[in-house]
From Swiss-Prot:
Its EC number is 5.3.1.24. Keywords: Amino-acid biosynthesis, Aromatic amino acid biosynthesis, Isomerase, Tryptophan biosynthesis. GO terms for molecular function: phosphoribosylanthranilate isomerase activity. Belongs to the TrpF family. This is N-(5'-phosphoribosyl)anthranilate isomerase. It comes from Lachnoclostridium phytofermentans (strain ATCC 700394 / DSM 18823 / ISDg). It holds the Pfam family PRAI. Pathway: Amino-acid biosynthesis; L-tryptophan biosynthesis; L-tryptophan from chorismate: step 3/5. It catalyses: N-(5-phospho-beta-D-ribosyl)anthranilate = 1-(2-carboxyphenylamino)-1-deoxy-D-ribulose 5-phosphate.
Length: 218
């Protein structure tokens, strides 16, 4: 299972992830709390270990801006966390070769089934929030995923269930080890669960990554 630490903002946080080596980090270009600009992202990317891939997180962003950051190699993957639909994703794919992660802020089985046919490379399942596009650190109800993969295994959605997915939403070192063993996520995504006072906490990052790796071994 891959690991992703999202919402990096400083060189100190880059030092932490370089030390413990998650597979991915996320640079957020939307919202307020963890938003950074392209100049900061470029600086952080230069200091990031070449073994770690940078994901740009966008909400209803212009395709031109995303393409420009991909071209500069500031990011290697694109995460769409807004209302981007099939037409948007297809148009983006014409402009960038980077893999695309589509966030699904799911409240129900039906919402996930509706999203499954989108032409992205990965899904990221996050908690629905009425007030923001992020999950705000609230735990994702993974029983929805279990239901999807049980109910859809023998119907027209079966072929889409092979697409890799991340689980996000309120994960911590304490609860990531409790993920349903019937699920087979490609990766887990964490942000607030490894923070103290709004900054990435080295001890929490280490604990989370080790807990995720141990779950992967079970």
């Amino acid at each position: 299972m891959k690991t992703k630490i999202c919402g990096l903002k400083s060189l100190r946080e880059i030092e932490i992830v370089n030390k413990y080596a998650p597979n991915y980090v996320g640079f957020v270009f939307a919202g307020v709390k963890r938003k950074i600009d392209e100049e900061v992202a470029s600086l952080l990317r230069r200091e990031l270990s070449s073994e770690i891939q940078a994901v740009g997180v966008f909400v209803n962003e212009s395709i031109e801006r995303i393409a420009k950051m991909c071209e500069k190699n500031t990011i290697q993957l694109v995460q769409l966390h807004g209302d981007e639909d099939r037409d948007y994703i297809n148009a983006l794919k014409l402009e960038v070769g980077a893999p695309i992660i589509k966030a699904v802020r799911a409240q129900s089985v039906e919402q996930i089934l509706e999203a499954l046919t989108l032409p992205c490379d990965y899904f990221l399942y996050d908690t629905y929030s009425e007030h923001s596009y992020g999950g705000e650190g609230k735990r994702f109800d993974e029983t929805i995923l279990t239901e999807v993969y049980k109910e859809s295994s023998n119907n027209e959605f079966k072929k889409y269930l092979q697409k890799p997915y991340f689980i996000a939403g309120g994960l911590t070192a304490q609860n990531v080890r409790l993920l349903d063993s019937r699920l087979e996520p490609y990766g887990v995504d964490v942000s607030s669960g490894v923070e103290s006072m709004g900054q990435k906490d080295e001890e929490k990052v280490k604990e989370f990554l080790f807990a995720a790796w141990r779950w992967n071994e079970n």
